[in-house]
Amino acid sequence: MPRPSHLNPDDILRFLQVSSDAASANEISRGLHLRKSDQRALFKMLGKLKKRGAIDELSGGRYRLRGRKDEPGAANHGGGPSLRESRSSQAAPPRDGASPTPVRILAEEQSLARDEVRGRLVLHHDGYGFVVPDKPIPELDGDIFIPRVAIEDAMHGDHVVAKIQRRAGYSDRQRAEGRIVRILDRAHASVVGLFRYGPRYNIVLPYDARLQHEIEIPPGEELTPQLREKLIAHDPAFDPKSPHARAKRIPRMEELDGAVVNVQILRFPRSGATPVGRVIEILGRPGELGVDTEIIIRKHHLPYEFPPAVLAEAEKRAQLPSESELADREDFRHLPIVTIDGETARDFDDAVYVERRENGAWHLQVHIADVAHYVRNATPLDQEARLRGTSVYFPDRAVPMLPEALSNGICSLKPQEDRLVMSALIELDPYGNIQSSRLASGVIKSAARMTYTNVNKILENDPEVSAQYAPHVENFRKMKELALLLNARRTEHGSIDFDLPERVIAFDDQQRMTSINRSERNIANRLIEEFMLTANRVVDAYLLHRGIPALHRVHEKPDAKKVLEFEELARAFGYSLGVEDLHRKEISVRHGTIPAAKAGRQQGGKGSRDRGGRSRGGGARSGGSENFGRDREMRVSLAGAEVAITPQHYQRLVKKITGKPEERILSYLMLRSLKQARYAADPLGHFALGFDEYTHFTSPIRRYPDLIIHRILKWALENPDASPRVNSPTVAARHAVPAVARHESRHDAAHLESRRAQTRTPAENFSAPSAPEKSALPQSAGEAVRYTDIQLREIATESSEAERRAAAAERELMDWKTAQFMEQHLGEEFAGLIISIQKFGAFVELAEVFVEGLLPIAAFEEAAGARCTYREFDHSIVAMSAGTTSYRDPYSRSEKSRSTYPSSRGDQSALEPPRKGRGAKPPTQRSWHLGDPVQVRADRIDPIRKRVEFALVEP
């Protein structure tokens, strides 16, 4: 009986995509390393792909992707999956040392069966996984669990179709379960890993533990001709013709054993067959300087090389502005405008200036680099910027969105150099309320390049720094005064200010880490934040007032379930959000007492994941139910229930905990309860800031959405009489509610009534467009653009994904660096604070160095000399000693063990289960809670997760 073929149509499409020319069947067979027995299947599949319109057959029996033109000189490069492909039907072959873009399988748009769900597969390093649905599904409160045996040939990150085999059960532990039935597109066209030499064949072990397939490297694919040329160029010792060659040879395969390599996947796993790939880059050895950064760049598929055409265009565009360009702009060069940035910043994209009027009113100018003048729409430079989406900042280097000729050159607002800008000119009353604003194109000459450190010293009356910048000292004091007023007005409207520090690594001259510290956020940082927030707000208000479709930075109201979970945790510390009827809603939801009619009305409620994945603090439980239908109704009610939560509830709690020992942990938990901010074509408002209108306008050098806003703004200023597209869903939704009503819908009515006479929203301040004449802006094609709603939605989705990708890469490399730093301190003891508790242990944040690590459950058991367990109802770890009795969890129908150890953590009467009568044993049980101080010892580094693990030190 013949063996089943491992041939996959996706493999053929991918091969044709990365090929520099059309390929014959024999070339495809050799490239995919097919068996002779697969030849008939190959021809049959080529015929099917041709019939479906996926490929074209050329003369001579050669094939290529439909709609593609052969461009031998074209090249793709390292980039995120499916972003470039979504923009162009033409696929280019990869450059050397680059991650090719995957091909989307034809079945993507197939209709789904009733029990099928389309989503993204997220695998766990233990083998199982979850499918995160593309769209919230009312019947599913969460993700779909996929057992190891049901993953089939899918890989982590793949876009898949899952067939639901079991619906969610009576508790959160029994979520919906399914299996993978189709793979729509592959997330990884390349994989970075360790090269392992073998006598018969070589393999690459992926660095991402969630990629659970070894990559087989067939003979001849370890060192391709292109890679050999690159090795020779890098080190003449490998050139057989060089007189300096040590051995006049290419290194043997065994010499590559243990090297870090980047592998292009030629054949994905199919019917149990191992995936096959070829080495396209040799990055170095683990532990070598900079190799960890290179690994993270490729692991997260960050575009890491600019194509030659993009670099050439950037050099061509990076010319000093001509007199004709300057003549058509408003001239601000006579004003003492300054930039304020970090110590190591080189891309200065914002500059500010403040005036105090004689009547006490304020005039604020925010000038932003006019990147749209240099990066024109639909050019190679623009396409590359869109692919990248954002600049990525690592501790030791950056991966910029734009080439250096622009980002650190002509677009950077360097001191004493003429620079083109887009300007927001804002008038405020003496109390910091916006009265009017005007947007214009301009030219500035920065008077000084300031740093946050020096501005802060000036504001603290440092005599040396104040003398150095004497001409600007008074202006900085005005900036501080205005910034405090703006912050006060923002606070009145419910803006939440989480002061959570970030990790900052200090290096010596040899790039060795010397410390990991908390970032400082001084008054200089805050004044720039306030000015940028104000500028972003007035730009969005202007575009909304004009009815022009735009990108918005939105932050939606948190889900009811997340609010309830946080409320439960806050009560353990004696705090509450103070939401009316929240406790009654919680009890009703937990016990399934919400009326069926109300539950039915709420089934359309939109569920959402939390802002950064699953919270480390654990989640609130849904009460058990003996009736599946009733429980399903209860779960839907929880996902879609409305809770009257406002930013003021969070803000009031932030004020209560400021300066308290529990501030760090509760601020972290509050942040986790909120949704993740994103880009959208609809003006949904920004919950955390308390704004109805908000966009990103102030960082076009490093964020693609800001560049889009600049183009839209230019179009709006060039066309002051253009009527809004009222048939646009975005515009229609905005115009459906008056501005004042929109504003009031987000704030307490009583509070707004007292402020109405003196406060107006930015949107209300545009009674007439205040813009220069149409001829005042350059008329070059591609500089001013009006986008359609469809285009904006695509860009919003891509930009949000790019932002999350960049954040994940930055976070992971920081974890790697932290692990490397702590390797030097293994065995040392530290004071720490428990900031999160899960079933497998507690996460501890150290006080001396800003490092977070895991205190495993085994460490508690070793310290207590008894078995320890995670107690879910109050998120604690409890030692199951002789003082344990039995109780029934008030939120569950199952028996639990509970502690009779008296609580010293404030009033926990609402959380602690009642004691079991007079028969309770003495309180001999130990427990650990969120916020508890602990003494730990750096014990080991988890080699898979690159995570520090601690041991508990007894006092």
Positions of predicted regions on the chain:
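Electropositive polyanion-binding surfaces
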Residues: 210, 257, 262, 267-271, ...
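Charge-lined substrate channels and their catalytic hotspots, especially those that engage the 3′ end
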Residues: 1-365, 372-417, 449, 454-459, ...
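C-terminal structured domains
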Residues: 923-925
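Compositionally biased, low-complexity intrinsically disordered regions
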Residues: 98, 732-735
